[in-house]
Design a protein with these regions (language model features):
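Class I S-adenosyl-L-methionine-dependent methyltransferase catalytic core
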Residues: 1-185
């Protein structure tokens, strides 16, 4: 499979539905800093109330997410003074570490960060120290490979959601650290 410009691979609903049912973000808006066509925010809007607010940040004007969209390079934006309740992102693979690092740096005390990553992203000499400093609170493995091409075909990679939670609370206790979702096509 040839790489797409800006690593744009839309996230299928099956890859995110179980995650959104599990998460219980504090009240506030949901932000996807690599929104593409808005698939993750569409799924969040279907699971949560529209009054929350949904912000799509997208570098490529060819993609038109059906939400409030800020056309900008997330990695060069200054931090928001009002962090979201939930950062949810399928970042470009080549920039995944940079996206996650920035989301973690910009989260508020109650913000949840969820990034869809290749499972192989966990194993890397390059990221060894980074993972020790930024280990997620939970990993959700997608048992079925999702199709990011819209034709049902999958690549040969396994995928996971890496999740960092805000402060634990009665409404949002820390869940199991490792679990499996069906998640595929």
């Amino acid at each position: 499979m040839t790489r797409r410009e800006n690593d744009h691979y839309p996230t299928p609903p099956a890859a995110v539905d179980e995650l959104l049912k599990e998460l219980n973000p504090a009240w506030g808006y949901v932000c996807d800093p690599a929104a593409g066509d808005g698939a993750l925010l569409d799924a969040a809007l279907a699971e949560y109330t529209p009054e929350r607010g949904y912000l799509a940040i997208e570098v490529d004007r060819a993609h038109k997410p059906p939400h409030y969209v800020l056309y900008a390079d997330y990695l060069t934006l200054p931090p928001s003074v009002d962090p979201p309740a939930l950062f949810i992102c399928n970042p470009p693979y080549a920039l995944a570490q940079e996206f996650v690092t920035k989301m973690l740096a910009e989260r508020g005390p109650d913000t949840i960060v969820a990034a869809l990553l290749r499972l192989g992203f966990l194993g890397s000499r390059k990221r060894h120290e980074w993972w020790k400093e930024n280990h997620p609170h939970a990993i959700r493995i997608l048992s079925k490979r999702p199709s990011f091409t819209g034709d049902g075909k999958t690549d040969n990679s396994e995928y996971m959601w890496a999740i960092w939670f805000g402060r634990p609370s009665a409404d949002n206790p820390r869940p199991r650290p490792l679990w499996w979702y069906a998640g595929g096509a």
